[in-house]
Amino acid sequence: MDSEKVGVNYPEQFHRISRTDRRRKKKLDRAVLFFDIDGTVLSEITKEVPVSAINAMKAAQQAGHLLFINTGRTICSIPPEIRRLKFDGYLCGCGTYLTYQDEVLFSSSIEKKRGKEILKKATECNLGVFAEGQEDIYYPERMSRFDGLESSRRYFHRRGMGMEQSIEKGDFIYDKIFLYEDERSDLKS
């Protein structure tokens, strides 16, 4: 609507801001889209990436949008079927690792000595624990009473991970831990 047709005279400054805002809007037409892996990109039923999802993601990239995986998993545990999709970047390990176009922009790991202390304390408190790093996943040597931990161990063992080194050895650097607790756990220590 033309301002003069309705009897309103906006100052020239308003028109300049409007043009600037239009330019900003054009820049904002490009979005960054974040996708989780489990149950989002990778079907929990078929354990595959649906063709419809692949087509939608390709269309989004062709439209100029950036696609990122945003997952609690660490970078080493991203399945090959996800990596083949050519995402623009990965935000992994609950925010501990960020890449964009194959360049690491941020990485935060727990220092080795401190990591050993944390795992030792978790074990002393009778918690189920496994550690996730950029290189591998680390499980206890012995089977755990926690079904979730053992289910995770089986899943990653099938993918060739979590078998090289146990948390008891502790000669590794990791980014995060996953804890399990129950009535036998000591949460007060």
Language model: regions and residue ranges:
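Non-catalytic pre-domain segments flanking phosphatase-related domains
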Residues: 1-35
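A general structural motif
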Residues: 28-30, 64, 126, 172-174
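Asp-based phosphoryl-transfer active-site loop
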Residues: 31-46
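Small/polar loops that bind or transfer phosphate-bearing groups
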Residues: 45, 69-70, 179
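A short acidic/small-residue loop/turn micro-motif
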Residues: 49-51
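Active-site phosphate-binding/coordination module
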Residues: 54-148
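Conserved acidic, metal-coordinating active-site core of Asp-based
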Residues: 121, 127, 132-189
